[in-house]
UniProtKB/Swiss-Prot annotation:
Stated role: Nucleotide-binding protein.
GO MF: nucleotide binding
Name assigned to this protein: Nucleotide-binding protein P9215_05621
UniProt family annotation: Belongs to the YajQ family.
Keywords per UniProt: Nucleotide-binding
Classification via NCBIfam families: PRK05412.1 (NF003819)
Gene3D superfamilies tied to this protein: 3.30.70.860, YajQ-like, domain 2
Pfam families in UniProt: DUF520
Family matches, as InterPro entries: DUF520, UPF0234-like_C, UPF0234_N, YajQ-like_sf
Organism the protein comes from: Prochlorococcus marinus (strain MIT 9215)
Length: 165
């Protein structure tokens, strides 16, 4: 019997790179002349980044810094889901950035259907927030990886193919 090959499709990011990115952002905020004295805070919890500052202009500057530093550290900008800007006490503004991780069930079904429609001799299974793509042909799997990278653009979520076996 022929050997079967597989890979996993995941939507995640390197958390340590995100922590490093936010450390660089905080350092730049403390050093930039236009941001000194703004009492800007950038905090990270399990699923969100919280930015609190004194004006919307400063908030936009901080968001630009976050994007620049994330790109330099090879983090996809698609992991950031920017929330509404809220007014908080003392004429300050707050924004919550949700960190997207994992593939939702409906998106997983779209990816699975698209791959199976394009490649007939392939098996796609949904395991929680990942997809396992298996086939007897390495060429089919390489074509599936190409399809996944094309789907990433249209679905607006970061997708990676890993565990290629």
């Amino acid at each position: 019997m022929a050997e079967s090959f597989s890979f996993d499709v995941v939507s995640d990011f390197d958390r340590q790179e995100l922590v490093n990115t936010l450390d660089q952002v905080k350092r730049e905020i403390s050093q930039r002349y236009d941001l000194k004295g703004t009492e800007t805070s950038v905090d990270l919890d399990k699923e969100n980044i919280f930015i609190i500052t004194n004006s919307e202009l400063t908030l936009n500057s901080v968001n630009d810094i976050i994007r620049q530093k994330a790109i330099k550290r090879n983090l996809s900008l698609k992991i950031f889901d920017y929330g509404e800007i809220e007014m908080v006490s003392g004429n300050r503004v707050k924004q919550t950035i949700l960190l997207k991780q994992g593939i939702k069930q409906d998106i997983a079904k779209k990816i699975s259907k698209n791959i199976r429609d394009q490649i007939k001799k392939i098996n796609v299974s949904i395991n929680g927030d990942t997809l396992r793509v298996a086939s007897k042909s390495k060429n089919d799997l390489q074509f599936a990886i190409k399809l996944v990278s094309e789907l990433e653009e249209s679905l607006n979520i970061p997708l990676k193919a890993n565990n290629f076996r």
